[in-house]
């Protein structure tokens, strides 16, 4: 019976230790990153406040619509590796809808953001402008007042 209790205790200890290691692996380190800026594709514009963009320079994953709600195109430019696109505005495009719609599109300066603490769906670049990583953390939801 004593052997059974020892095995149970060792198994329990291994499980608890494993949980601590797993939780610790999910945590981000506290040191600051050396990132230059971040780009987070966001929904922009509206039928009454149009944006100046074209399909080539629009972000992949974002859809672009006319003032009447007609789908125009999906963006073609990858923030990690932007295309060389003309600078003209497509006057048919009024607004975009992107998977992430809250917060800033351009994060500069990045402060103490690291790849671990950066938001999923945001792309982070070094001070030399080269792509470093995509963020790994879930973006907090904006606080909604119930009053």
UniProtKB/Swiss-Prot annotation:
As one GO molecular function, the record gives: serine-type endopeptidase inhibitor activity
Site features described as Reactive bond for trypsin, chain residue numbers: 30-31
Q: Where is the signal peptide?
A: 1-25
Q: InterPro entries under this entry?
A: Prot_inh_I20, Protease_inhibitor_I20
Start and stop residues of the sequence repeats: 25-81, 82-141
Question: Per the record, where is site Reactive bond for chymotrypsin?
Answer: 87-88
Question: Cross-referenced Pfam families, in alphabetical order?
Answer: Prot_inhib_II
Cite the entry's keywords alphabetically.
Disulfide bond, Protease inhibitor, Repeat, Serine protease inhibitor, Signal
Disulphide bridges in this chain? 28-116, 32-112, 40-122, 52-89, 55-73, 56-85, 62-98, 115-133
User: Highest taxon of the source?
Assistant: Eukaryota
What the record says about family reads: Belongs to the protease inhibitor I20 (potato type II proteinase inhibitor) family.
PANTHER family found in the cross-reference section: SERINE-TYPE ENDOPEPTIDASE INHIBITOR, WOUND-INDUCED PROTEINASE INHIBITOR 2
Give the protein's recorded name.
Proteinase inhibitor type-2
């Amino acid at each position: 019976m004593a052997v059974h209790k020892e095995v149970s205790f060792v198994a329990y200890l291994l499980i608890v230790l494993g949980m601590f290691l797993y939780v610790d692996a999910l945590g981000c380190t506290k040191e600051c990153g050396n990132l230059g800026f971040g780009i987070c594709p966001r929904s922009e514009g509206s039928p009454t406040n149009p944006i100046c963009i074209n399909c080539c320079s629009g972000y992949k994953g974002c859809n672009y619509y006319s003032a009447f709600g007609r789908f125009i195109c999906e963006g073609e430019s990858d923030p990690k590796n932007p295309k060389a696109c003309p600078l003209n505005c497509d006057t048919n495009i009024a607004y975009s809808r992107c998977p992430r719609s809250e917060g800033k599109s351009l994060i500069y300066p990045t402060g103490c953001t690291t790849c671990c603490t950066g938001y999923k769906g945001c792309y982070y670049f070094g001070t030399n402008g080269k792509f470093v990583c995509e963020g790994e953390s879930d973006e907090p939801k904006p606080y909604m007042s119930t009053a």
